[in-house]
Amino acid sequence: MTTEPVLVTGATGNQGGAVARALLAAGRPVRALVRDPSSAAAGRLAAAGATLVRGDLDDPASLEEPAAGAAAVFSMETADYANLMADFEVQRARNLVAAAREAGVEQIVHSSVSGAGNDDPGAFDEERWGAFPAHYWRSKIESERVVREAGFRTWTILRPAGFMENLKQPSLWFAGFTSNRLGVVNDLDVARPWIAVQDIGTATLAALADPRRFHGVVLELAGDALSLRRAVEILNSVRSTPIELPSAPEQALAWGVPPELAQSQRRMDTYPAPARPEMAHALGIETTTFEQWAHGAARSE
């Protein structure tokens, strides 16, 4: 096993945190990129055994030292939520990739989103879906291109499905973030893919452990496929306080679902995410079912 560290971006967030935990549990050295080493989340990473390195994806110079000597990079970028229409996500990917290539890093695992391979022009119709959903998907596609064309010896792209964790408060999916009202305008009875965030860590670990096998793999990553109605039924069977589903899209909007989120949800119904559990299983990656996740989430309440 290599003693060179893996540089993990987004380490204090959901995905990066899951990756850091999976690597540490497997005995892989983790270099966690954080903007504020004094934060509580950073402290928990350090206590778990990660080495904290200060850096900011918006500051290319700050990435040089963290990338130096790393065996691989876990790449996960987001938009700037204070300026959703800017190109921060793509630029952050470019900054990280440039620093990693300059440092001689040979492997990258990049996390995108299920469905980012859809090139149907209708999927980017701003008049139909709004400016932000179209921009969001273009950014995901462009960030993937940046990774693929950077010249790493080996690269892997993960396209996770919707997070199971989105159905646990606080979450944007709930009216007011913390209520028990699920603010969705989607079709409640159509099966959709789900992933437990911990499985992103599992998949990343698998790719890092076998770079050649996973080189060029674009994995649509899911642990289960079931409808929103069925997901809520499972959760309500283990929760002390039930989640309330809207009786119709109009009710969800009355609960205060942001228009941009409603547009994104409608797009999801028209262009459903293609990830399915068997895609990960075919590569030997074990995943978490929704029921398994729900019971674990209930225990942590």
Regions found by a protein language model. Give the residues of each.
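General small-molecule cofactor/ligand-binding pocket signal
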Residues: 53, 244-248
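Aromatic "clamp/platform" in nucleotide-sugar-dependent glycosyltransferases that forms part
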Residues: 89-93
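Oxidoreductase cofactor-interface core, primarily capturing Rossmann-like NAD(P)-dependent enzymes
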Residues: 2-43, 58-61, 68-72, 78-88, ...
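Acidic/glycine-enriched edge-of-secondary-structure segments
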Residues: 49-52, 81, 192, 300-301
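Rossmann-fold cofactor-recognition segment
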Residues: 46-59
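Short, flexible active-site loop motifs that bind/organize anionic cofactors or intermediates
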Residues: 10, 53, 190, 221, ...
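A hydrophobic C-terminal alpha-helical subdomain
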Residues: 22, 214, 238-239, 248-301
